[in-house]
Amino acid sequence: DEEKWSNNMKSNILIVDDSALLRRVECDIINSDNKLQATDTCKDGLEALEKLRTQKYDAVILDINMPRMNGLEVLSHLQKESIKTPVVVVSTLTIEGADEAIKSLELGAFDFVTKPNNIIEAKGNQFKETLLRVVHAAVRITPVHSASRNVTVVEKKAGAIVNKNKAAGSNKIVAIASSTGGPKALQSVIPFLPAELLAPVVLVQHMPEGFTKTLAMRLNEQSALSVKEAAEGDVLKN
């Protein structure tokens, strides 16, 4: 929180991963920062849940695919038990990983980072900088579970996105740009926009290839507006 940061106190981070090597790498990354410290580690979700029920952490770095209890199951328990520790999910760079990452946001995760493919990437600057940036953002937020509302699939009415008063919004667009924490924030905004919005909406979100498509598909399911991943030659229409 802000008081801890202003007093130069270190934020306590819990690291959860079934890979001993990745736990070690993530601990080294966190401990290299003068505002963070890796307080505890767990090798599966069940261990993590037990710790989170009894101890306080400023953020959790959580793997998805683990034995006994996976990351999505942990998030589901945290949500049901109103444990609001900010969670940063580590996701594989695959289609399945993209689905799991977007699902984790709906279950209350703050954001996600993609898992390194090998030890060279794990110890590289890109993974280190990305992980530290997201963890720093996570520990500074006020923990809320915006995804605790029921996520429903919206049935779009035929012609619902056609603007009857075309002149009113013909020269306007709504532009939204987001970075760390952005995918979760978009899930709290886009589904609440009306189908009769008088201007097209453009979203700019830095994500790995494939993840933007998955996010767009999920937002489309939840929203009255039609949402799609942009493609070359697309034309913005009211």
What are these regions (language model features)?
Residues 5-238:
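Strand-loop microenvironment adjacent to phosphate/nucleotide-handling motifs in alpha/beta enzyme folds
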